[in-house]
Design a protein with these regions (language model features):
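Solvent-exposed coil/turn segments that connect beta secondary-structure elements
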Residues: 25, 33-36, 54, 104-105, ...
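Ligand-binding cleft/hinge of the Venus flytrap
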Residues: 8, 58-77, 95, 111-115, ...
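Pocket-lining segment of extracytoplasmic ligand-binding domains
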Residues: 73-166, 170-171
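Extracytoplasmic/secreted envelope proteins and their assembly/folding machinery
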Residues: 17, 41, 59-63, 88, ...
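An extracytoplasmic/periplasmic, membrane-proximal ligand-sensing/linker region
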Residues: 86, 93-94, 103-121, 131-134, ...
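Ligand-binding clefts/hinges and TM-proximal coupling segments of bilobed small-molecule sensing domains
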Residues: 54-64, 137-207
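Soluble non-cytosolic domains of exported or imported proteins
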Residues: 35, 53-60, 82-85, 100, ...
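Short, glycine-/small- and polar/acidic-enriched structural segments
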Residues: 1-45, 50-53, 64
């Protein structure tokens, strides 16, 4: 909607995009080998890093952060472009020092990396990140709970987006209304569909981490429920 990734979307902003509701947070997650010397995001410079495959969410976020940091791919000893399904094995095979992932937690791929070899979750928090979050409403600071993954006992600060269910102005209001009604009339069942959904609250799902205006069909339901004026 905002048109902030010209490489992925050369046609510019997609102003027909509409949010329906947000789901779970997807923190930008950096996992590093314990023997790599990487403790914070700044330590990635000069290391072997999987930046994600072109077009992926983690690659898009990584490129945004790199631009703000003033980094290029040449600042890494290796900038691999592995898919998210390939990077955990590469980390534990010592082919890379760190990997990035924009994902909800707990996540199976990260559990694989942290149980198959000695790996840690890395803090992503510096003045550049603070400004990035302050300047963009669709980003927010996030915390990955300590103890969720082997090797990381304390909470880890990072930032990220919220996974959002979206539609467009081309989808009629009644269709979106019926989808929203099905989800929220059965919210307890919906929350059991994935561990990352467990803490979802309708009051937050309709206002937090929405990167586009709400669809008219969603607004109709929320007003009927008294959740919006």
């Amino acid at each position: 909607y905002n048109g902030t990734a010209p490489k992925q979307f050369p046609d510019g902003a997609f102003k027909e995009l509409r949010a329906v509701f947000s789901v779970h947070p997807e923190p930008f997650t950096v996992v590093a080998r314990a023997d790599s010397g990487i403790k914070t995001f700044d330590d990635l410079k000069g290391k072997r890093v999987n930046v994600g495959d072109p077009g992926s969410g983690q690659r898009g976020t990584m490129e945004v952060v790199m631009e703000k940091m003033g980094w290029s791919m040449d600042d890494f000893a290796l900038a691999s472009e592995l898919k998210s399904s390939e990077q955990s094995a590469a980390l534990c095979d010592n082919k890379i020092d760190a990997m990035v992932f924009t994902v909800g937690h707990p996540n199976g791929s990260i559990k694989e990396a942290t149980t198959s070899c000695d790996a840690i979750i890395v803090t992503v928090d510096n003045p550049v990140i603070k400004k990035l979050v302050d300047d963009n409403a669709y980003y927010a600071f996030a915390s990955i709970p300590g103890g969720m993954y082997k090797g990381t006992d304390n909470d880890v600060t990072t930032f990220g987006v919220g996974a959002t269910f979206v539609s467009s102005t081309k989808t009629d209001a009644d269709t979106v209304y019926q989808i929203v009604k099905a989800v929220f009339d059965n919210i307890d069942r919906f929350k059991k569909m994935h561990p990352a959904f467990a803490t979802l609250e309708p009051s937050r799902m309709i206002v937090n981490n929405l990167s586009a205006p709400l669809h008219d069909g969603a607004v109709k339901y929320y007003k009927e429920k008294g959740w919006m004026q």
